[in-house]
Every structure is written in structure tokens, then in C-alpha cells.
Amino acid sequence: MKTFESLFAELSEKAANQTPGSLTVDELGKGTHFIGKKIIEEAGETWIAAEYEGAERTAEEMSQLIYHLQVMMIDRGITLDDIYKNL
């Protein structure tokens, strides 16, 4: 099972190594605006799932939202510690 920390480490490694075929690398290459649109999309899907589709689907959408948030963190040079100090 992945944790917030292990996911961030995995995504950071893919970004640093420019792993061929990586969706993370592709998304980072498309830039902040694209990543932001994905965050908005997943946030909306999370809300719809919570409202109408149940816990399992909501958790799935939340995990996708967290993924895109972490991609944005990497894109903007934000670390886990930056997030933790603001919680």
C-alpha cells in the first residue's frame, strides 16, 4: 500500500529521471496550467462521487486528486515539509 510519502518519492524519482512513458513526466511537461486543470477536474469528480457514488468511488477519486496535487507540488518545487508546516 502506498502512503502520501511513498507516492511523492515515486513521482519525484520519475520526474528526476524523466522516466520514458511516465504519465507523471508527460503531465509535468505540459506545465502548471494543464496540471491545474487536472486538479480542478479531479476535485469536481471527487465531489460528485461523494454526493452520488459512495465511499469506494469517492476514495478512488480522492486518490487521483492527491496524485495530481503531488504532481503540482513537484512542478512548483514544493516539498512534503512545505505542506506539513502549513497543516
UniProtKB/Swiss-Prot annotation:
Compartments it resides in: Cytoplasm
Q: Does the keyword ATP-binding apply?
A: yes
Q: Which reaction does it catalyse?
A: 1-(5-phospho-beta-D-ribosyl)-ATP + H2O = 1-(5-phospho-beta-D-ribosyl)-5'-AMP + diphosphate + H(+)
* Any one Gene Ontology molecular-function term assigned to this protein's record: phosphoribosyl-ATP diphosphatase activity
Main localization (coarse): cytoplasm
Q: What is its EC number?
A: 3.6.1.31
Pfam families according to UniProt: PRA-PH
Please provide the record's keywords in A-Z order. Answer: Amino-acid biosynthesis, ATP-binding, Cytoplasm, Histidine biosynthesis, Hydrolase, Nucleotide-binding
Q: Which Gene Ontology BP annotations are present?
A: L-histidine biosynthetic process
Q: What family classification does the UniProt entry report for this protein?
A: Belongs to the PRA-PH family.
Could you tell me what this protein is called? Phosphoribosyl-ATP pyrophosphatase
